[in-house]
Design a protein with these regions (language model features):
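A polyanion-binding, active-site-adjacent surface
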Residues: 2-219
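Intrinsic-disorder-associated, low-complexity terminal segments enriched in Asp/Asn/His/Tyr and depleted
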Residues: 227-230
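Ala/Thr-enriched low-complexity intrinsically disordered regions
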Residues: 233-235
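Catalytic cores of phosphodiester-bond-cleaving enzymes
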Residues: 238
Length: 238
């Protein structure tokens, strides 16, 4: 790691420590307080070039402290075409949800939406401190709304999740420096959605897997010094 990258990571580590110590959803909540002790979960680094921007941890992740340690994670890794070792290599893949803590469940046992405190307090600071990403995978409506607007792509946000995901080719090609994907949550609750929208697995996933592989390969070549191109100005081929 270069001296500049070390300083960048050191500053990021301080911000992540602040986030992991956050208790705003108990001490200064926007609405009902969190029904349990906070446990913010995120994995970021100054070198990762793929961002998994998800919704919020579930019950298993709240206990493990590691994102996607559940059936949803198994399905997501299958979608991406990566194994657990690659997925959890924080030097290559960052994982940052819209809500860092498990938000609790409703009366029917479904997970509540991400807490609003996280985005308001932390997200702008966090993504300003992180490098530009090759790929941003926005999972679920809250992540899509935040990141598409942050990237100046708010006009591509559909009236609902299906419309946004169905516009994936337009969303993907909207920037030269970063490819953005809008994805449904990989929860079993969306199995019916996947059956109703077979184009997702037939058309979108092969392109997503190819982009994941290309980004990982480019990062590997840069790391080994075989690619001398400036990462700050790197663009995707048309």
């Amino acid at each position: 790691m270069s001296d500049g990258a070390f300083v960048e990571q050191e500053g990021l580590d301080g911000l992540v420590a602040e986030i992991r110590a956050c208790r705003a959803c108990l001490d200064a909540p926007l609405g009902p307080p969190l029904p349990h002790e906070p446990r913010p979960v995120l994995r970021v680094s100054s070198t990762a070039r793929i961002l998994v921007a998800s919704q919020a941890p579930g019950t298993k992740v709240h206990l493990s402290g590691l994102p996607f340690t559940d059936a949803s994670g198994d399905r997501l890794r299958k979608w991406l075409g990566v194994d657990k070792k690659t997925f959890y290599d924080v030097s290559r893949i960052a994982i940052a949800a819209m809500g860092f803590c498990f938000p609790g469940q409703d009366a029917k046992g479904a997970d509540l939406p991400p807490r609003r405190e996280c985005a308001r307090l932390w997200h702008d600071r966090l993504f300003a401190a992180l490098p530009e990403f090759d790929l941003i995978l926005t999972i679920g409506r809250p992540a899509q709304a935040y990141h598409l607007k942050r990237l100046g792509l708010g006009h591509l946000l559909g009236t609902g999740l299906t419309q946004t995901v169905a516009s994936w080719r337009q969303v993907r090609a909207s920037r030269n420096d970063t490819r953005v994907y809008a994805l449904p949550h990989p929860s079993w609750r969306n199995t019916g959605w996947l059956k109703k929208n077979p184009w997702f697995e037939a058309d979108l996933l092969p392109e997503l897997q190819a982009d994941i592989a290309a980004s990982l390969d480019r990062a590997e070549r840069v790391c080994k010094g075989r690619d001398k191109s400036d990462r700050e100005t790197a663009t995707w081929p048309k």
